[in-house]
């Protein structure tokens, strides 16, 4: 269920302050955050945020297309190694 429009988007306060200061001073440093739950708002566009995926920080450059999404959507937490192969076909090919 989506968030109520009257509440507005959720952004962690400490993250918003860091991004506001970076925009104000023109600082291009990467901002580290554990706040995967924060919504990307238009003020974030042009900033690089390093989002924690549970193991390491993934740098995410924020563009206009990302506005309205959550930061966590751009830092996957799971690694997909593929499904197990068919063992019969390997044996069959050896004939």
Swiss-Prot record:
GO CC annotations on file: cytoplasm; small ribosomal subunit
Top-level taxon in the UniProt lineage: Bacteria
Keyword Disulfide bond: no
GO biological process, one term: ribosomal small subunit assembly
Keywords: Ribonucleoprotein, Ribosomal protein, RNA-binding, rRNA-binding
Keyword Ribonucleoprotein found: yes
UniProt xrefs under InterPro entries: Ribosomal_uS19 (IPR002222), Ribosomal_uS19_bac-type (IPR005732), Ribosomal_uS19_CS (IPR020934), Ribosomal_uS19_SF (IPR023575)
GO molecular function: rRNA binding; structural constituent of ribosome
NCBIfam families for the chain: rpsS_bact
Function: Protein S19 forms a complex with S13 that binds strongly to the 16S ribosomal RNA.
Family to which the UniProt record says this protein belongs: Belongs to the universal ribosomal protein uS19 family.
Annotated protein name in UniProt: Small ribosomal subunit protein uS19
Organism whose genome encodes this protein: Syntrophobacter fumaroxidans (strain DSM 10017 / MPOB)
Upper taxonomic lineage: Bacteria, Pseudomonadati, Thermodesulfobacteriota, Syntrophobacteria, Syntrophobacterales
């Amino acid at each position: 269920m989506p968030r109520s429009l009257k509440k507005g988007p959720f952004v962690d306060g400490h993250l918003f302050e860091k991004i506001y200061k970076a925009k104000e001073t023109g600082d291009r440093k990467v901002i580290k955050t554990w706040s995967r739950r924060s919504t990307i708002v238009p003020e974030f566009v042009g900033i690089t945020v390093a989002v924690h995926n549970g193991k390491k920080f993934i740098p995410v450059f924020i563009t206009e297309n990302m506005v309205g999404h959550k930061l966590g959507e751009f830092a996957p937490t799971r690694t997909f190694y593929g499904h197990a192969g068919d063992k019969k076909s390997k044996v069959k090919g050896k004939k």
